[in-house]
Amino acid sequence: ALVLIDKKNRKRERKLKGFTKEVSTGTKSISFFLSPSDVKNTSYLSYNWDDPSKDNDSWLYLPSLQKTNRISGGDRSNSFMGSDFTYADLDGVEIEDYTYKIVKDSDVVDGADCWVIEATPKSKDVIKETGYLKTLTWIRKDIFFGVKGRILVKKGKKVKLWSAKDIKKIDGVWVAKTQQMTTTKKKKREHSSIFIIDTIAFNKKLDDSLFESEAMQRGY
């Protein structure tokens, strides 16, 4: 589920189902919105290539227009379906595009000791693509897993606060079943979004046809 919370604490919930498949050249993912009716059958398809010189590909299908829109590099900093998460947040970043430094060797988050790592984009192109100037991430030392983030947004002098909760090991993989992103300005909350995973399974056989543009239009 994706829960959107405005500054007056009014909530809207969107149900979705997603699939991800590792292929020889990278990772393919597709998500289908199930409800409410205004977003039902909207779908998002992304290809994240292992080759850092190759741009990732992603598309959004809007059933009301019966149209599939390609998400270009300049659009990846845009909001995903009205949420505080961007397309770039969903697709992830190229590690090689940033310089890193440990700004704090020890900080405790939810009882777990963490490193605090600062990531700075190496180029203006990366800033344009992500919309972010700098990111602080709290990484748990015991499981090498990100649990908290503070993101400096390029536009509007805003700061995003990210957190990962309900962290479980499922089929040998560490997963945050709840992720929240909050947009703030002058330390005041403007909007929040929460991704909640109800059920998750790994190592399932998925047909390649599920990750093609035709599948977006067929819906789930």
Placement of each model-derived feature along the sequence:
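Compositionally biased, low-complexity repeat tracts
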Residues: 14, 22, 27-28, 78, ...
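N-terminal mature ectodomain segment of secretory-pathway/periplasmic proteins
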Residues: 1-64
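Short amphipathic beta-strand and strand-loop transition segments with alternating hydrophobic
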Residues: 17-21, 99-108, 165-167
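Short, solvent-exposed mixed-charge patches
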Residues: 219-220
